[in-house]
Amino acid sequence: MTTTPRIAITPGEPAGIGPDLVVAVAQVPCAAQRVVLSDPALLRERARLLGLPLEIRPFDPQTPAAPDPAGCLTVMAHALNAPVRPGHLDTANARHVLATLESAVAGCLDGRFDALVTGPVHKGIINDAGIPFTGHTEFLAERSGAPTPVMLLAAGALRVALATTHLPLRAVADAITPAGLEHVLRVLNQDLKTKFAISEPRILVCGLNPHAGEGGHLGREEIEVIGPVLERLRTQGLHLIGPLPADTLFTPRHLEHADAILAMYHDQGLPVLKHAGFGRAVNITLGLPLIRTSVDHGTALELAGSGRAEAGSFMEAERLAIEMARSAHGL
């Protein structure tokens, strides 16, 4: 490890706004060394379209990491498979996108990189290329040999983790099992300690049903699943509050001393977070043997190369990755 964090950055879909965001954040001095895994020609061309200065330096893992000056990027070259037109997807570049991710994961696992920041990928075009791909999280978990990862989104001091992720609403109740819920809470508690430097995390847990089940009259998941799991983990030292009604949990009185919230399903917790932190929310994958943060938006093909893409979420993802790397690696 180095005293200056070395952060791997994958821009994602080359026809989307990922390269725009990388060029934009390069205009701001960074406390870490950014190592962008991309095609240098792509970054130079996107900088030209945006009218921004860009100096590219080749990555040398033998050289100690040093903070990047404004207008400069360190690049670990990965050639495109086909020319890129902003806003126009091409299946030929699907393998390029995955190659950058493969290389970034390998670098995080072998210690060359201290954290990973991922730009938005286009799942559809990767699958259209004949490569099964469900998303960053699953890809990173498989490549790093991790068990079921946990999705956490953050906007400022508000952190919301999910007990279930991308499921139809009718499938959510059956997906909340004692073993699954315990796993999520243990991962959340442990990563808040190691990656966020919170010595005794205080976690608020939502109920599944309206009014947290109203004593069993509006559903029994709180009584039969959620409550017993919380009780068992409390006896092991976890500081868990709940199950609480979600409609009152997200109020200043409850949030004031909370380090994280566990929502039972995607649209229970994320609308509040995105309302509070629109444009600066960050997606974080917990439970991996590496630090990964990401933007909380898509490829925005229609904005690529236009200069109209907002870099707020990317900059926050980078800032948080650096902060987490310092906590986890003692940098």
UniProtKB/Swiss-Prot annotation:
Its subcellular locations are: Cytoplasm
Q: What class of enzyme is it?
A: oxidoreductase
What is the top-level taxon of the source organism? Answer: Bacteria
Q: How is the cofactor bound?
A: Binds 1 divalent metal cation per subunit. Can use ions such as Zn(2+), Mg(2+) or Co(2+).
Q: Which UniProt keywords apply?
A: Cobalt, Cytoplasm, Magnesium, Metal-binding, NAD, NADP, Oxidoreductase, Pyridoxine biosynthesis, Zinc
Example of a GO biological process term = pyridoxal phosphate biosynthetic process
Question: Pathway involvement?
Answer: Cofactor biosynthesis; pyridoxine 5'-phosphate biosynthesis; pyridoxine 5'-phosphate from D-erythrose 4-phosphate: step 4/5
Pfam families recorded for this chain? PdxA
Q: Which cofactor does it need?
A: Zn(2+); Mg(2+); Co(2+)
Among the GO molecular function terms of this UniProt record, one is: 4-hydroxythreonine-4-phosphate dehydrogenase activity
Q: Which InterPro entries did the record assign?
A: PdxA (IPR037510), PdxA_fam (IPR005255)
Positions bound to substrate: 136-137, 274, 283, 292
Example GO CC term: the record gives: cytoplasm
Q: Reaction catalysed by this chain?
A: 4-(phosphooxy)-L-threonine + NAD(+) = 3-amino-2-oxopropyl phosphate + CO2 + NADH
Keyword Transport belongs to the record? no
Might you give the EC number(s) for this enzyme? 1.1.1.262
Which positions in this protein are listed as binding a divalent metal cation? 166, 211, 266
**Other known facts:** The active site is located at the dimer interface.
What interactions and quaternary structure are annotated? Homodimer.
Q: What does it do?
A: Catalyzes the NAD(P)-dependent oxidation of 4-(phosphooxy)-L-threonine (HTP) into 2-amino-3-oxo-4-(phosphooxy)butyric acid which spontaneously decarboxylates to form 3-amino-2-oxopropyl phosphate (AHAP).
Tell me the HAMAP family matching this sequence.
PdxA (MF_00536)
Give the protein family.
Answer: Belongs to the PdxA family.
What is this protein's record name? 4-hydroxythreonine-4-phosphate dehydrogenase
Source organism per entry reads: Thioalkalivibrio sulfidiphilus (strain HL-EbGR7)
Gene name on record? Answer: pdxA
